[in-house]
Structure formats: C-alpha cells, structure tokens
C-alpha cells in the first residue's frame, strides 16, 4: 500500500483539484493526526455555518459586548444613523441587531394608518409595506430577521434603515408620547 500524503484540498468528500490531484483520498491510508486535523476543519466549518444562520447574538458571529456597548452609548437610532453615515466604525452586524430592536419598538398599526392616508399610486406605500413585513417577521423570529437583514447588500440595507428611521420619526411626530402631551396641556 503506497503512503501518499493526505489531500489538503478535499472538502466534504470532493477534492478541489479534481482528477489531477496526486494526494491520497483514501481515509484508511491517512495517519491519525491528518484525520484529526480534517475532522477539526470540518467541525469548524459546520459550526461557522450554523452560527451564522441560527445564533446571531453569540460571540462567534460578532454580536458580543462591543455591539451592546455601542448601542448603550449611542442608542438604537444612534447606532443606525452612525452606520448610515459610516462613522464610529459600526459593523453591519451591530446595525442589523439595532434595526431588529427598532422594528420591535414600532407598532405596525401606526404604519398601516400612515399607509392608508397615502394615495393609491404613491411610492411610499411600497416602503410602508416593506417595513410592515419586517416588523411581522421580527415578531415571529428576531434572529431570522437579523440574518435576513445581514444578507441584504449594504446599499439596500442602508436604504431600508433610512426608510425605517423616517417612518419611526413620522410616527413620533404624529403620535407624541404621553409625557409630551402632558407638557403641552400645562
């Protein structure tokens, strides 16, 4: 039995070099050390792919304490505006987590009220419907919503964040908080 070196280019049972590969693909010929290295490599790949899709708030995926301290210092809107303006080195991950929290704060009934005031041909109706769908998705599964937001291209994500902030501000102008109403009455 010939002792060729184990293939370094094999991933999930397929060699990236194709038929011209001169390394061994027979696992029974591989020394135990090479099998352990391959097993560790495969487990790390599985862990990374699972972490990205399921657990968006873990340390591995990047939403650890750093993002939470940014949010604590700047607030949810501050993090999103910093991401839009490309200041304070806000990552896409922290912007998506902050966006999810903002979507949780907005009431979809308020947006439906704004949408119903618009003309049927208004381009704002599509924006309102998009934000409403993100709010509904966020209520069902916030982690999946964060994952969906992270998969958006940067320019589309920035446009979505800007539209959501505009709608949030529009709702706050139309429906002032109870504290503001009490101050106006006095």
Swiss-Prot record:
Residues 32-49 are annotated as: Oligomerization. SMART domains: ZnF_C3H1 (SM00356). Its main location: virion. It comes from the Viruses. This is Protein M2-1. Phosphorylated by host in infected cells. Phosphorylation is not essential for zinc binding activity and oligomerization, but zinc binding activity is necessary for the phosphorylation and oligomerization. Phosphorylation up-regulates viral RNA synthesis, replication, and pathogenesis in vivo. GO terms for molecular function: RNA binding; structural molecule activity; zinc ion binding. The modification Phosphoserine is found at residues 58, 61. The gene is M2-1. SUPFAM superfamilies: CCCH zinc finger. It comes from Ovine respiratory syncytial virus (strain WSU 83-1578) (ORSV). Pfam families: Pneumovirus_M2. Keywords: Activation of host NF-kappa-B by virus, Host cytoplasm, Host nucleus, Host-virus interaction, Metal-binding, Phosphoprotein, RNA-binding, Virion, Zinc, Zinc-finger. Essential for viral replication in vivo. Plays a role in the association of the matrix protein with the nucleocapsid, which initiates assembly and budding. InterPro entries: Pneumovirus_M2-1, Znf_CCCH, Znf_CCCH_sf. Contains a zinc-finger domain on its N-terminus essential for its function. Contains an oligomerization domain. The central globular core is responsible for binding to RNA and phosphoprotein. Residues 76-169 are annotated as: Globular core.
């Amino acid at each position: 039995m010939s002792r060729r070196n184990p293939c370094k280019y094999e991933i999930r049972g397929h060699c990236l070099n194709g038929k011209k590969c001169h390394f061994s693909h027979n696992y029974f010929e591989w020394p135990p050390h090479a099998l352990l290295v391959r097993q560790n490599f495969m487990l790390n790949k599985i862990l990374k792919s699972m972490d990205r899709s399921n657990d968006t708030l873990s340390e591995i995926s990047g939403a650890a304490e750093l993002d939470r301290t940014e949010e604590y210092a700047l607030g949810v809107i501050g993090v999103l505006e910093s991401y839009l303006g490309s200041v304070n080195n806000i990552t896409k991950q922290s912007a998506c987590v902050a966006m999810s929290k903002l979507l949780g704060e907005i009431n979809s009934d308020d947006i439906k009220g704004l949408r119903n005031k618009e003309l049927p041909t208004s381009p704002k109706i599509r924006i309102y419907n998009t934000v409403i769908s993100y709010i509904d998705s966020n209520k069902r599964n916030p982690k999946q919503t964060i994952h969906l937001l992270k998969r958006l291209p940067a320019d589309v994500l920035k446009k979505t964040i800007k539209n959501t902030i505009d709608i949030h501000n529009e709702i706050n102008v139309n429906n002032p908080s109870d504290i503001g109403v009490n101050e106006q009455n006095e």
